[in-house]
Regions:
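Low-complexity, intrinsically disordered Gly/Pro/Thr-rich segments
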Residues: 70-76
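Short S/T/G/P-rich N-terminal loop/turn motif that feeds into the first structured element of a domain
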Residues: 1-49, 56-67, 79-96
């Protein structure tokens, strides 16, 4: 499994816009092959927000990065006041 993390900082008072983008992103991702889930998080006091998407395989993640992410990055970049932090991680799941 693979995870994609995005963290960005906005100007003050952008929480409702960030939530709208999160809702749109989830709606776009939920039916895509390999999508396992997403967690959105934020710190409104410091205007910092982020997401962590889970994908079944690296190939699934790569396919999404080519097709959907350019538009999502455009939207995120419009909200961000500094370059967003983007990372991809291989996920380790402990064995029982």
């Amino acid at each position: 499994m693979y995870g994609q993390m995005l963290i960005f900082k906005t100007a003050s008072g952008k929480l409702s816009e960030v939530e709208k983008v999160a809702d749109q992103a989830f709606a776009a991702m939920k039916g895509i092959k390999g999508f396992k889930g997403v967690t959105y998080f934020g710190d409104p006091d410091n205007n910092e927000y982020g997401s962590f998407y889970l994908w079944e395989t690296k190939e699934d993640l790569d396919a999404v990065m080519k097709e959907i992410m350019p538009k999502m990055q455009e939207v995120t970049n419009a909200l961000a006041i500094e370059p967003p932090l983007r990372r991809i991680y291989e996920i380790y799941e402990p064995k029982p």
